[in-house]
A protein has these predicted regions:
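N-terminal, positively charged nucleic-acid-binding surface of large information/translation enzymes
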Residues: 1-193
Length: 193
């Protein structure tokens, strides 16, 4: 792909042309396939909440998360970049409750059947995925959306429980006390990101 200096071509045109070039030539896929699996660099990328649209903060961290795998790829490592969606926690619950107009958690199971709440939550988890994919592509980040995982999927949850059980059996889990921020609406600690 050639660019001419001193042209008035707009950045958006270059962006679209470059993305099309990468897709047509399967540049990202080849950057993985052409490297030996025994020469891997594993990069764990904490997934974003699917409940919100991409914004400055998520994009800033996303660009940083793209730099590390690209560095190791350029050093000859095979770096698979599997995308994921965080579908659990307060952001997901707040998102669904806002959509349903729930103002009191006691409405779940009374005014709103639990099955309805869960189905609405599952449907909501895919609502913003297209906007995310488009935005991540436009900032030039290379990730595998086709093999994306969701924290609400049974296989994912079972793997987490398996890992927890393994840690417990090795005596690495303990009960303790710690001061945390607290969400008074949901009566639960707020995770520290």
């Amino acid at each position: 792909m050639k660019y001419q200096a001193n042209t008035r071509r707009r950045a958006l045109e270059y962006e679209k042309a470059l993305i099309e070039f990468w897709k047509k030539n399967q540049t990202f896929e080849k950057s993985i396939e052409q490297r030996d699996i025994d020469n891997s660099y594993v990069f764990y990328d904490g997934p974003p909440f699917i409940t919100g649209m991409p914004h400055h903060g998520t994009l800033l961290s996303s660009v940083t998360k793209d730099a590390v795998p690209r560095f190791w790829t350029m050093r000859g490592k095979r770096v698979e970049r599997r995308w994921g969606w965080d579908c659990h926690g307060l952001p997901a619950e707040n998102f669904v409750e806002k959509q349903l107009g729930i103002t009191d958690r006691r409405e779940i199971g009374t005014k709103w059947p639990l099955a309805t709440y869960i189905e609405k939550a599952k449907a909501s988890m895919v609502a913003n995925s297209e906007a995310w994919e488009s935005t991540i592509e436009r900032i030039g980040r290379w990730v595998d959306f086709r093999g994306a995982y969701r924290t609400m999927d049974k296989n994912y949850m079972e793997s987490v429980w398996w890992a927890f059980k393994t840690l417990y059996e090795k005596g690495l889990i303990f009960e303790g006390r710690k001061v945390l921020m607290y969400d008074t609406k949901f009566s639960t600690p707020v995770s520290k990101a």
